[in-house]
Amino acid sequence: MAYDSKHTELLEPKEGYNLTEKEYKKYWTHLNSFYSLSFHRFVPRERENYRILDLGAGDGRMYPQLKGLEPEEYVACDCAEKLLAQHPGRIKKVVCDLEKDRPFEDQSFNLLSAFFLLEHIEDLDHFFAESYRVLSDRGQILIGHFLQKRLFMRNVQAKRFKIVQYPHTIEEIEKAAQEA
């Protein structure tokens, strides 16, 4: 834990997002344009035995769009167990640190989604290496990323904080994805 300005704590994603579990949805407004997307045009038409791993799934903000792909299995994965507990639906929920190896078998998913996640990943090389490991041969990674100049301030339970972020450029993300 560190301070990046007077009386503002800088928290790791797990701690910060667990604190925001009940108020997280009010922070969604700047992301609303993503919620009207249809992912059908990005994935194969034939999706037999289709398995989706939603990385950084949080409270399920992207679940309606991913559920619309009618996967055989959808798995939500996040480091913040309290936020993940808010995720709707009767689905498999896995708490894991995406900076480490993932608790999934090799080539076990057809689609990995990572929306608004990469800014919380320090080691992109490891992130993509692990993503490719659990991805099937013809699998895809669907990434939603936005660039922001400053961290969002959060005030929860009389605690003022920001969540650690790493300002990766699109070029850095592309390079890490290609070299993994």
Task: Please report, for each region that a protein language model flagged, where it lies by residue.
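Conserved class I S-adenosyl-L-methionine
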Residues: 1-47, 61-65, 83, 142-167
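Class I SAM-dependent methyltransferase SAM/SAH-binding core
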Residues: 59-100
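Short conserved loop adjoining the S-adenosyl-L-methionine
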Residues: 101-106
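A conserved beta-strand element that flanks and buttresses the S-adenosyl-L-methionine
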Residues: 113
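Short catalytic micro-motifs in class I SAM-dependent methyltransferases
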Residues: 116-117
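A short glycine-rich, Lys/Arg-flanked "PGG" loop and its adjoining helix->strand segment in the class I
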Residues: 125-137
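Short alpha-helix
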Residues: 165-180
